[in-house]
């Protein structure tokens, strides 16, 4: 029921005048709640986590990074979510590169990167980024009703560990063939 209300809401929004904060507050925050994440729980949300960049190769014009969201499952970060402004419909490889730097930080070590500008949400596996323009899962306004269950299976606090386990088993099976 709540998922249906969210997808109905999603289909109606014009994100063209949304800045990054609007995307975060009006779209991502409710989505994280539906996915089962909440502050001060075992499946919590770390917001705007600031981290120091210590390695010279990490420092690309800055010494600190700030991660928009790092949802946790059993207090461990499996993924990060980076919000992007809605006034730019297409996210690009620069957005993914920024998020990759965040996800691979030694204090985070996330398995998945999620980029969201409201128009669409893209999920990348940190260890399987072969094509920077092709996420392993993408959902947009136009297909949110048909793909929301799959999004839930991948990112929800209840199902992510099982999804990750299946993904690892599949990769291992391919490797051992």
Please name every model-derived segment:
Residues 1-112, 120-177:
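A short, conserved, highly charged catalytic patch centered on acidic carboxylates
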């Amino acid at each position: 029921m709540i998922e249906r209300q969210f997808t109905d809401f999603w289909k109606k929004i014009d994100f063209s005048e949304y800045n990054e904060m609007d995307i975060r507050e009006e779209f991502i925050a409710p989505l994280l709640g539906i996915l089962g994440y909440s502050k001060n729980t075992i499946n919590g949300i770390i917001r705007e986590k600031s981290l120091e960049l210590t390695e010279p190769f990490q420092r690309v014009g800055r010494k600190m990074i700030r991660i928009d969201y790092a949802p946790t499952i059993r207090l461990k970060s499996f993924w990060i979510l980076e919000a992007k402004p809605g006034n730019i419909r297409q996210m690009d490889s620069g957005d993914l590169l920024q998020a990759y730097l965040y996800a691979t930080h030694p204090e985070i070590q996330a398995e998945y990167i999620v980029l969201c500008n409201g128009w669409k949400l893209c999920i990348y596996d940190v260890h399987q980024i072969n094509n920077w323009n092709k996420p392993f899962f993408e959902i947009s306004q136009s297909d949110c009703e048909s793909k929301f269950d799959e999004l839930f299976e991948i990112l929800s606090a209840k199902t992510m560990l099982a999804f990750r386990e299946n993904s690892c088993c599949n990769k291992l099976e391919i490797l051992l063939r």
